């Protein structure tokens, strides 16, 4: 039986209907259906046809048969690495990929090259290529604190992972065991649901031929750890708290940590783990004389022991070693460690601000590869995403350029859907460094919001970035939005009042232009709601009114934040929770 999937998209045949296409050229061929041929793929890979056809149908949701774009998917071993080539000619498209993940990424390239209209879609005869410049492109789903990744149902999580694969990302890092920080508030049903989603998530990553990496840990311990094993506290606030960390130099403490780690590894049994990542600080570390500097002494001694446990459980797994919050003392000893080891696949390097100077000034030891850790969620304002989209593409292009010459990829740290645009831009830069942030904004808009003026979209996002940071020096809650609208610089508040009003008008103009099928989608709503909220915050200098409260409640639904809101009402959590309650 042939594995052929047909998605019907209709051309309405009555007079007077104009089919609007975004950036459609004169040679663009018009279609209203797609027929996918997956005969050359394994049966377990045929779902790519459903992914591809569903994305077209969502944008051009019509219902009778007209011209059909025939698309064939196949794996071509003659292609290198994870590259793909897409040939479109005379109503037929062939997507060839070096491996299945490349086929999926190639499908994404074709989807983003199509011009979508209300009744038809079109694409000219063309040749497209997927040949990522940086080999490792991973997204880190922070599944904790009742955020979207923690609480989203399986179908939404799998859909989002599919999107990451269509963008050409090739790895996912996530938390598969229930997060210890949330366990004290969790019912047994919460843990069971989390485990079920974890299993589905891991299976989907494997089906998409992506790598799945998990935390290899550091010296963080369960809350019931023996008090006599407690680590000496960090003195640098950037490194986070380490109240629940163990000093491995205390007699009996190393054996305790190894037993805890064996238990964690046992919980991963049967899951398709292909990599692990060790982490030093935030949370982690010990400031005692035998462990300090932690990043170059206690940390590397500990992960040398851990990595053997993971090798036994997951032979050949990738090993990533983070250098988060390292100082020069950490780096000096860590470089000595790197020169004398043969097992680290990537070091993970970045900071809360600019890219660290040490690896830029000191060449990496021979054979060592570096990936960056763009902090795309938690910069410049708080709570994160609670007021709509976080879009800072220019910042992340600047950071990308700082490390472009030494990096082999990236790991994007994400706390939710609200920085989806940042994910797309940063991943796009690592795929193709010749692109710029504004180029990628236009690509995002053409695909996600067909019909809108892409240059207007670039201008719109520039204002979101320009008004993003809400820092007030010398105040207790220095990055809180609610603090900024009252105590921020008067002149800047007045300026934001004017530009945010104009930006809301621009959002409404774009919304009128874009296809009706995408106006209610969450990607547009988090951007539009940011514009609505900004306009209200700076025009009223108040955190609550009927317009704001309605916007916050819509975001609660988009973020699956209902449980997080309950926690806020009880006095805990709220890192990505819209400020629905009066006391937030």
Regions found by a protein language model. Give the residues of each.
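Sec-dependent N-terminal signal peptides
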Residues: 4-14
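Contiguous, structured surface segment used for ligand recognition
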Residues: 19-137
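Boundary/entry segment of secreted carbohydrate-active catalytic domains
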Residues: 28-31, 133-148, 156, 175
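Second-shell loop/turn segments in exported
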Residues: 36-44, 94-97, 146-150, 188, ...
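Extracytoplasmic/secreted proteins, especially bacterial periplasmic and envelope-associated proteins
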Residues: 47, 51, 55, 102-105, ...
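Catalytic-core regions of glycoside hydrolase
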Residues: 115-120, 144, 170-172, 182-452, ...
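Catalytic domains of carbohydrate-active enzymes, especially glycoside hydrolases
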Residues: 155-178
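Catalytic domains of carbohydrate-active enzymes that cleave complex glycans
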Residues: 404-407, 417-419, 431-584
């Amino acid at each position: 039986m042939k594995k052929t999937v047909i998605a019907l998209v209709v051309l309405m045949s009555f007079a007077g209907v104009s089919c609007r296409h975004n950036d459609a050229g004169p040679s663009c061929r018009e279609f209203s259906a797609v027929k996918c041929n997956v005969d050359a793929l394994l049966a377990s890979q045929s779902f790519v046809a459903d992914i591809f056809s569903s994305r077209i149908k969502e944008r051009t949701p019509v219902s009778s048969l007209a011209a059909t774009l025939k698309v064939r998917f196949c794996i071509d071993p003659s292609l290198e690495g994870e590259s793909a080539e897409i040939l479109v000619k005379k109503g037929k498209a062939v997507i060839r990929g070096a491996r299945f993940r490349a086929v999926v990424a190639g499908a994404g390239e074709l989807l983003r090259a199509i011009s979508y209209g209300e009744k038809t879609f079109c694409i000219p005869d063309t040749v497209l290529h997927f040949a990522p410049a940086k080999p490792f492109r991973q997204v880190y789903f922070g599944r904790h604190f009742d955020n979207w990744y923690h609480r989203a149902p399986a179908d939404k999580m799998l859909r989002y992972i599919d999107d990451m694969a269509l963008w050409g990302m090739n790895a996912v890092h996530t938390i598969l065991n229930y997060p210890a920080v949330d366990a004290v508030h969790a019912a047994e049903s919460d843990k069971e649901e989390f485990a079920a989603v974890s299993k589905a998530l891991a299976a989907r990553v494997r089906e998409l031929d992506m790598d799945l990496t998990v935390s290899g840990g550091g010296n963080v311990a369960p809350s019931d750890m023996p008090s006599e094993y407690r680590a000496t506290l960090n003195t640098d606030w950037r490194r986070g708290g380490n109240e629940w960390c163990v000093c491995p130099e205390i007699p009996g403490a190393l054996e305790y940590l190894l037993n805890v780690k064996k238990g964690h590894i046992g919980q991963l049994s049967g899951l398709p783990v292909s990599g692990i990542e060790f982490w030093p600080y935030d949370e982690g570390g010990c400031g005692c004389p035998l462990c300090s500097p932690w990043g170059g002494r206690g940390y590397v001694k500990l992960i040398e022991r851990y990595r053997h446990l993971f090798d036994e459980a997951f032979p050949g797994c990738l090993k990533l070693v983070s250098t988060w919050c390292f100082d020069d003392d950490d780096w000096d000893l860590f470089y000595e460690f790197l020169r004398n080891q043969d097992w680290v696949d990537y070091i993970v390097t970045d900071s809360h601000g600019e890219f660290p100077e040490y690896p830029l000034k000191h060449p990496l030891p021979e054979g060592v590869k570096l990936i960056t850790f763009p902090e795309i969620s938690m910069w410049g304002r708080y709570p994160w995403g609670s007021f709509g989209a976080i879009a800072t593409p220019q910042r992340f292009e600047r950071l990308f350029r700082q490390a472009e010459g030494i990096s082999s990829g990236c790991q994007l740290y994400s706390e939710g859907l609200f920085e989806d645009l940042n994910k797309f831009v940063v991943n796009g830069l690592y795929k193709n460094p010749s692109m710029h942030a504004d180029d990628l904004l236009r690509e995002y808009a053409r695909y996600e919001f067909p019909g809108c003026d892409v240059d207007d979209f670039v201008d719109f996002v520039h204002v979101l970035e320009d008004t993003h940071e809400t820092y007030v020096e010398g105040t207790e809650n220095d990055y809180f939005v609610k603090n900024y609208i009252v105590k921020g610089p008067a002149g800047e508040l007045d300026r934001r009042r004017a530009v945010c009003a104009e930006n809301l008008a621009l959002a409404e103009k774009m919304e009128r232009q874009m296809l009706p099928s995408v106006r209610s989608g969450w990607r547009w709503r988090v951007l539009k709601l940011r514009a609505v909220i900004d306009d209200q915050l700076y025009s009223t200098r108040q955190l609550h009114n009927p317009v704001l409260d309605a916007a916050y409640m819509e975001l609660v639904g988009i973020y699956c934040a209902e449980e997080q809101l309950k926690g806020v009402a009880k006095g805990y959590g709220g890192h990505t929770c819209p400020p629905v309650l009066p006391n937030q």
